[in-house]
Amino acid sequence: MTATSPYLELGYVARAHGLRGEVAIRALDPASETLDTVDRIWVRTRAGVEREMRLEALRPTPKEDIVVLEGVESRNDAEALVGAKVFVFREDLEPPAEGEFFQGDLVGLDAVDANGNALGRVEEIWTTGEVPNLVIRASGREELVVPFADEFVPTVDLEARRIVIHPPEYVEAGRKGAESGGGPEDAE
């Protein structure tokens, strides 16, 4: 979904929980507390059915949130939602501060280096450490994984749908080694 979409992808329904229709929603960002702040979500099932759903109750756990959704009354109802993508309404969220971005707005941006050379497109965001990592892919190129920090991502232009990347040295060293036929240890 684009930056102008009324929704931001939050995560997915990981599994049914219990017998009374609860579902476990796993956020793409494990540290996200967004679900605690909204009363409704937008759900897109694997079959492509989309609908708004109201949250009736939420119980956080270390890996996911256990949620009661309006109209989901049984385990069968809950199992029908497993694998569904979960979105939040942009209008229900506080706008990001100056220089900050919703992670979902970064996915789909074209990535270029400081000289404007195409590196690929931001396809995913991995949140495995203190800062998220942008996963940049392009046909015929190795995948780039770049920390989303000012040092490596000096410019984000949502209007132009473009992000400027300064890859970490180890990535550049690996690319030089690959171009010369050797591995990173052969790079200067």
Swiss-Prot record:
Keywords: Chaperone, Cytoplasm, Ribosome biogenesis, rRNA processing. One of its GO terms (molecular function) is ribosome binding. Residues 98-171 form the PRC barrel domain. GO terms for biological process: ribosomal small subunit biogenesis; rRNA processing. GO terms for cellular component: cytoplasm; ribosome. It is found in: Cytoplasm. Its main location: cytoplasm. The keyword Chaperone applies. InterPro entries: PRC_barrel-like_sf, PRC_RimM, RimM, RimM_N, RimM_N_sf, Transl_B-barrel_sf. Binds ribosomal protein uS19. NCBIfam families: 16S_RimM (TIGR02273). Belongs to the RimM family. An accessory protein needed during the final step in the assembly of 30S ribosomal subunit, possibly for assembly of the head region. Essential for efficient processing of 16S rRNA. May be needed both before and after RbfA during the maturation of 16S rRNA. It has affinity for free ribosomal 30S subunits but not for 70S ribosomes. The PRC barrel domain binds ribosomal protein uS19. This is Ribosome maturation factor RimM. It comes from Myxococcus xanthus (strain DK1622).
